[in-house]
């Protein structure tokens, strides 16, 4: 059962963290599993409270790609570093971070040289577009 809880830190936070995309049914993350991508978080409340690790779409991770349990790498203190979940058929996905703030490479202060105009988060939006065309 999914529930929203107050985050551990009670201040608004806006910063980059890393997420490792999990294998899931989410249509948004097709062919993205195991990618580790920086992403913006920006919120003052909310952390994911999930009793089981089913349908997890991604986890906050540290620089060694281990699940981050504590602030600041897990900015809201979600259990098991859960950043989001999807429903059983993958058509509904909810997540705390903001991929819309990081889908263009120019939205980052620094990016790897192998990124083109779009960051890896653009694939999430492209997947949604392709799903809607079917």
Q: What feature does the model see in each segment?
A:
Residues 1-10:
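Single conserved hydrophobic/aromatic residue that forms the stacking wall/gate
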């Amino acid at each position: 059962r999914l529930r929203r809880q107050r985050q551990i830190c009670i201040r608004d936070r806006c910063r980059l963290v890393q997420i490792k995309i999990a294998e899931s049914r989410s249509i948004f993350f097709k062919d993205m599993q195991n990618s580790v991508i920086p992403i913006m978080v920006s919120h003052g409340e909310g952390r994911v409270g999930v009793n089981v690790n089913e349908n997890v779409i991604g986890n906050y991770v540290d620089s060694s790609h281990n699940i981050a349990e504590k602030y600041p790498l897990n900015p809201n203190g979600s259990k098991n570093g859960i950043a989001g979940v999807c429903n059983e058929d993958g058509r509904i996905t909810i997540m705390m971070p903001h991929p819309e703030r990081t889908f263009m490479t120019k939205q980052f202060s620094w990016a790897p040289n192998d990124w083109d105009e779009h960051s890896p988060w653009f694939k999430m939006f492209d997947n949604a577009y392709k799903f809607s065309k079917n």
